[in-house]
């Protein structure tokens, strides 16, 4: 599998090394969050007007999205998973607020902003849907909090 980041082909060989703990890598929302980080990083690297501290803060908040999706997934608890997804959503808000600031200060162009915003919006909606689905699973009791399959009852 390969992703495209600003026209640059990126190898995704790490996806061939699979186990249950790396299952988050199959989530489209995680893949898109990684893509967003790449798009933001490439955009900001082209703009000398953006100071280092602000660039670092934006990249940190953007990277926090995929990191929280992964950490929540790996916790195995639906309650913790949902909590980490909410943290990811908060990081989405922080990232967007900083990007709006850059646009307002004319440190990125409207075209650059729109490109990022479209991807950001898509990820935000996918995160919201994932939270809703997990909350339903939690409420129905359909979540298994263990790596191994539960043993079937013998009759």
Question: Which sequence ranges carry the predicted segments?
Answer:
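Amphipathic alpha-helical assembly/interaction segments
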Residues: 1-155
